[in-house]
């Protein structure tokens, strides 16, 4: 068995490999180099590695590494990409792991490339020949944009682990449920003309005013109809995030576009939500036809919930001595959950994610190593 780098050497190498994902091709980057790093390290530890190209991506890949045979066992999962960074707001080099005052700075230190350094370091300290069930490690692409990596993996994967842990930054607090995310663009095409005679045009802003009234009715109905007591905000939310329209004060507005999102609870199916949205805007479609269009800004992400009775929930709560929680942000959990019961649990704080001078506190290092070793022992040694 070959010797692998130290924890900090691996951590540094991961941060030094840029893997930003973005809808904008100018900022979007391949994760090939990082995937190859992980594959080489895990191969050195005796894992079988499979690098999986993602069709329809810009040179993106998943990695599945397996030690052992058969079904069951544990899947440790995470994404390899980061969001882009605002160069003017960073004091530290985003691609150089920098330790200062008990904090490790760098893009992806917390969210979440650093998790793979923790996993490989923990695995390297174990006697893997004692495993009686397989240990799998999954590294995905494009979580920060389309979740293409996780979506593709579940479509083609035949593995059935006993459970999965996604190492997103949760401050080592277990998460067993979160809301989903639906982003929509409502576009209204009017008819321009001189503002001195509004009757000769169709004002898209006025139509949008009418449409937002229907959407606000739907927002109130969602709040009344759906409830989940485990969430701090126990109902689905709707937010009008961006609007644009018109080009001159003396012209009838010919075009107006609204971007809004809905965060459904786990008990609200995406098909039901879409039907509700179409029905609520039906009067607009019937009256104005092709002047009204509704298009998804991204593939919808469903809500996610792992039953409290699941073995992984019971084991993790006992190991950590605390109850699982819920959050309002999204992860790949709704997709991995289709394979097996899944928890979100990892080092670092979500408060540092997507922030300038992202960091992971050194206080997470030893507890994370210990927790990963216990989880592998619990689920892979029978």
Curated annotation (Swiss-Prot):
What Enzyme Commission number does this protein have?
A: 3.5.1.16
Q: Does the keyword Metal-binding apply?
A: yes
Q: Name its GO BP terms in alphabetical order.
A: L-arginine biosynthetic process
InterPro entries recorded for this chain? Answer: AcOrn-deacetyl, ArgE/DapE_CS, Bact_exopeptidase_dim_dom, Peptidase_M20, Peptidase_M20_dimer, Peptidase_M20A
Listed A to Z, the keywords are: Amino-acid biosynthesis, Arginine biosynthesis, Cobalt, Cytoplasm, Hydrolase, Metal-binding, Zinc
The protein, known as: Acetylornithine deacetylase
Q: Which domain of life is it from?
A: Bacteria
Quote the gene name from the UniProt entry. argE
UniProt lists the family membership as follows: Belongs to the peptidase M20A family. ArgE subfamily.
């Amino acid at each position: 068995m070959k010797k692998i780098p130290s924890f900090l050497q691996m951590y540094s190498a991961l941060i030094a490999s840029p893997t930003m994902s973005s809808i904008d091709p100018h900022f979007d980057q391949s994760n090939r180099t990082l995937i190859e790093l992980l594959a080489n390290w895990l191969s050195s530890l005796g894992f079988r590695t499979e690098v999986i190209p993602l069709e329809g991506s810009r040179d993106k890949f998943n990695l599945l590494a397996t030690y052992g045979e058969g079904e069951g066992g544990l899947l440790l999962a995470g994404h390899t990409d980061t969001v882009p960074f605002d160069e003017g707001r960073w004091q530290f080099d985003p691609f150089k792991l920098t330790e200062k005052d008990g904090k490790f700075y760098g893009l992806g230190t917390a969210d979440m490339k650093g998790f793979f350094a923790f996993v490989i370091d923990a695995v390297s300290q174990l006697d893997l020949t004692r495993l009686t069930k397989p240990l799998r490690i999954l590294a995905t692409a494009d979580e920060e944009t389309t979740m293409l990596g996780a979506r593709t993996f579940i479509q083609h994967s035949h593995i059935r682990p006993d459970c999965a842990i996604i190492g997103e930054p949760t401050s080592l607090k277990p998460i067993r449920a979160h809301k989903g995310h639906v982003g929509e663009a409502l576009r209204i095409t009017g008819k321009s003309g001189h503002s001195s005679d509004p009757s000769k045009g169709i004002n898209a802003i006025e139509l949008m005013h009418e449409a937002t009234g229907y959407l606000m009715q739907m927002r109130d109905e969602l709040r009344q109809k759906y409830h989940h007591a485990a969430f701090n905000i126990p109902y689905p939310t709707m937010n009008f995030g961006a609007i644009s329209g018109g080009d001159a004060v003396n012209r009838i507005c010919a075009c107006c576009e609204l971007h809004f999102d809905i965060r459904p609870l786990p008990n609200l199916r995406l098909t039901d939500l879409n039907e509700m949205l179409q029905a609520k805007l039906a009067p607009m479609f019937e009256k104005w036809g092709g002047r009204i269009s509704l298009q998804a800004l991204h593939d919808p992400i469903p809500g996610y919930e792992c039953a409290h009775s699941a073995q992984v929930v019971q084991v993790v709560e006992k190991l950590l001595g605390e109850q699982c929680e819920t959050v309002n942000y999204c992860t790949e959990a709704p997709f991995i959950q289709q394979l097996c019961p899944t928890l979100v649990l990892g080092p670092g704080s979500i408060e540092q994610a997507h922030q300038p001078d992202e960091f992971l506190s050194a206080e997470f290092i030893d507890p994370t190593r210990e927790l990963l070793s216990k989880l592998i022992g619990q689920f892979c040694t029978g």
